Amino acid sequence: MTVMTVLQALGDRGMDQLYTIQASASVAEAVEEMGKYDIGALVVSTEDRLLAGIFTERDVMMRVVRAGLDPRRTPLSLVMTRDVHFVTPGTTLEAALALMYVHRHRHLVVMDGPHLHGIVSMRDLAYQLIRHGEGRFEAAVRLAGGPGT
């Protein structure tokens, strides 16, 4: 199973929209967008629409709140993650999860050359692995005391 499988599944559920914001936007604007769309990360782009970085909930907490910065006056370019790790659509889910684990990321950008396909979260990848685990999802829900158990 590959990252493309996850992107297709997100598309089937109407969750494949790629949300971007310019690096010159404020942290407050980014947080507003993230809240509006109930997402945990935004792709940050340059004025030329090139990938500049990624801005995540963790960036808000560790680089803005913890540092005592004013979200209304702080541009994303100062606090976004610039060292973006990415996967291609053909990357296996296991390899993507390993990359997330090693680099402590919850989100990965999906790129193929200069073409930006989207973002996948650890939750998106885990859901697909569990969903295709031939009944393991139901067993995991029962063990966790989830709904219907």
Each language-model region and where it sits:
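Tandem CBS (Cystathionine beta-synthase) repeat/Bateman regulatory domains
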Residues: M1-T149
